[in-house]
Amino acid sequence: MSNDGRSRNRDRRYDEVPSDLPYQDTTIRTHPTLHDSERAVSADPLPPPPLPLQPPFGPDFYSSDTEEPAIAPDLKPVRRFVPDSWKNFFRGKKKDPEWDKPVSDIRYISDGVECSPPASPARPNHRSPLNSCKDPYGGSEGTFSSRKEADAVFPRDPYGSLDRHTQTVRTYSEKVEEYNLRYSYMKSWAGLLRILGVVELLLGAGVFACVTAYIHKDSEWYNLFGYSQPYGMGGVGGLGSMYGGYYYTGPKTPFVLVVAGLAWITTIIILVLGMSMYYRTILLDSNWWPLTEFGINVALFILYMAAAIVYVNDTNRGGLCYYPLFNTPVNAVFCRVEGGQIAAMIFLFVTMIVYLISALVCLKLWRHEAARRHREYMEQQEINEPSLSSKRKMCEMATSGDRQRDSEVNFKELRTAKMKPELLSGHIPPGHIPKPIVMPDYVAKYPVIQTDDERERYKAVFQDQFSEYKELSAEVQAVLRKFDELDAVMSRLPHHSESRQEHERISRIHEEFKKKKNDPTFLEKKERCDYLKNKLSHIKQRIQEYDKVMNWDVQGYS
């Protein structure tokens, strides 16, 4: 009986849908097309499903007792001498490592990863992730008929792939621009200091290596003479001091090594600090840091100069090598200068010069940053406190001959006002709220012209508001000229009068004149005049840009 049931199941086609199919989702039951039809929407025979990589096994797969269940393959743990993590570390990352694994390494049971919820039928455009553990169409796991049912009711979006984010390869120009933006800091004086710091580290390492290579000579000296003057050379030392020499008590190599190590550690700290964002944003805006860095470089210059003098003095043993009484065949090994010692002396003096150059660059950086801060301060003052003369220039417009130019739409040269954002430098105090940058409405309302129709529309707007601007400009200009005349008259009035009544009368005149200047109607007209001037300048600039592009196109085709 079980064999007949299996044979009938084999004869059934894969595109047939039984009428008594249990549904897991209640939303699909409401569609009667799935209950009335025995087949799916597509009547074309479908290819058989792909076979699994390995046949299933186990006692639950076979319902008959006559047939022997398949023997489970002998699964043994794979023991490798070199772990895979080490291989992947030396091999590098791959884009899709699962494709390169052999069949025996494929895991048919997923890890303990949390499964994503199934896709909702009410949202046909939603795509479940690839690692979902359930069928996204509401059927059982891996059933082919449930996919056909969902495709029939909710067809897939053919344009679903358009919203995928594609990662394009950057061009050479984009890479060069990013490189210049990232490393343009190295072109400044602060960047030169960082380069000199790297040179100082290399030279300091050379000093340390060369001096350490011949430290055994110091041990031989102390083993032979101890920590005092050489035996029998006290008189020689006294004679040398009599003729301007000095005493020599032993090598001072530890002092040279301490100076080289201290300078190396200080230099690497300054170098790491200089490559940070804190150095660029905070320290460079301060007045004390460039001078502090100058002092550090001067101190290291003095230390290296002292170390170089001490090391040169050690090579000739404090001048004892110049005396025949000391320079005997027994002591000749102490007076012989090796090639590594000569290299150490060269490195010491070159490093000393590099630290001196770094100190001079720090002074140049201090002056450069002071000039930059002063320039930013002056620009901020010009933005915050515009002069009265600049305001008057914005409303100046000649009224003679304007009617004739209106008909020909001849635009007058109108310079646009420069709108610069407020610059904040230095440490931002807590609770500081920056002032918003107010952008005029006509900037977004009148973008770049693309067609001739837009040019005609811009031209009509210009003609319509140019007459209003002329009237306001003439009126405001007349009032400003009247104010200039009254200013001249008011300046001639006496500031201190002998009579009290005269003083009160002059005070009332000043107050009345101040009220006239601050009249809301006049200020509103003046503000409207400034707005129209900037707006017309913007529209005129857009039209000129479009005409220039069109002229280029005509010349190119001709």
UniProtKB/Swiss-Prot annotation:
GO annotation terms (biological process): bicellular tight junction assembly; cell-cell junction organization; establishment of endothelial barrier; sensory perception of sound
Specify where the region named Disordered lies, as residue ranges: 1-58, 115-145
Domain named MARVEL: residues: 188-367
Q: Name the Gene3D superfamilies on file.
A: 6.10.140.340
User: Keywords, A to Z?
Assistant: Cell junction, Cell membrane, Coiled coil, Deafness, Hearing, Isopeptide bond, Membrane, Non-syndromic deafness, Phosphoprotein, Tight junction, Transmembrane, Transmembrane helix, Ubl conjugation
Q: Where are the transmembrane segments?
A: 195-215, 224-244, 255-275, 292-312, 320-337, 342-362
What pathology is it implicated in? Answer: Deafness, autosomal recessive, 49: A form of non-syndromic sensorineural hearing loss. Sensorineural deafness results from damage to the neural receptors of the inner ear, the nerve pathways to the brain, or the area of the brain that receives sound information.
- Its recorded name reads MARVEL domain-containing protein 2
Q: What is the lineage of its organism?
A: Eukaryota, Metazoa, Chordata, Craniata, Vertebrata
